[in-house]
Amino acid sequence: MYQDKILVRQLGLQPYEPISQAMHEFTDTRDDSTLDEIWLVEHYPVFTQGQAGKAEHILMPGDIPVIQSDRGGQVTYHGPGQQVMYVLLNLKRRKLGVRELVTLLEQTVVNTLAELGIEAHPRADAPGVYVGEKKICSLGLRIRRGCSFHGLALNVNMDLSPFLRINPCGYAGMEMAKISQWKPEATTNNIVPRLLENILALLNNPDFEYITA
């Protein structure tokens, strides 16, 4: 019988491509008995272009590599100090639709920020989470055979200047924000427990096992 347990992997700071490849391999080889997983990772500086991404949104990449991804959405930036959470879930088994998963991820971030006294909200016209008009968290998902991969990227205490080299998520002039603008002491290490607690609560508090790389 299937056990509702999630494996949570803390992967630390990693290059984008090997993690992306591992995520694809996991999704391609999983079956109905495979436990769901959540991967927590920070990436070395990289621009990733979404499946429908348009080249004109990459303005001046400079020395930062641009990598094609198969997630939804347009171009975004990943770098140290940004907490990425990849959600490798069997949506059929969890009876979750894609829109419900997007809402769940947005609510995870809204709830996490609320605990820090930061009022944030999703936007109907542009997926992600915003503080005022500024974007603090980006979302991008892919569904294959009823299973999700990719996920969210929450700006914690990162250098935001590389976002000026692109139109983030395809929006010219989109301003970005990070948690440390309101909470200077914020780090990915002290944000992860809150983020994890909030997503697990919205997934009905399954058992989980925390694995560090």
UniProtKB/Swiss-Prot annotation:
Residues 32-207 form the BPL/LPL catalytic domain. InterPro entries: aa-tRNA-synth_II/BPL/LPL (IPR045864), BPL_LPL_catalytic (IPR004143), Octanoyltransferase (IPR000544), Octanoyltransferase_CS (IPR020605). Keywords: Acyltransferase, Cytoplasm, Transferase. Its EC number is 2.3.1.181. PROSITE patterns: BPL_LPL_CATALYTIC, LIPB. Substrate binds at residues 71-78, 138-140, 151-153. GO terms for molecular function: lipoyl(octanoyl) transferase activity. The record marks 135 as: Lowers pKa of active site Cys. It is an enzyme of class 2 (transferase). The keyword Acyltransferase applies. GO terms for biological process: protein modification process. Pathway: Protein modification; protein lipoylation via endogenous pathway; protein N(6)-(lipoyl)lysine from octanoyl-[acyl-carrier-protein]: step 1/2. The active site is at residue 169. Catalyzes the transfer of endogenously produced octanoic acid from octanoyl-acyl-carrier-protein onto the lipoyl domains of lipoate-dependent enzymes. Lipoyl-ACP can also act as a substrate although octanoyl-ACP is likely to be the physiological substrate. In the reaction, the free carboxyl group of octanoic acid is attached via an amide linkage to the epsilon-amino group of a specific lysine residue of lipoyl domains of lipoate-dependent enzymes. This is Octanoyltransferase. It comes from Escherichia coli (strain 55989 / EAEC).
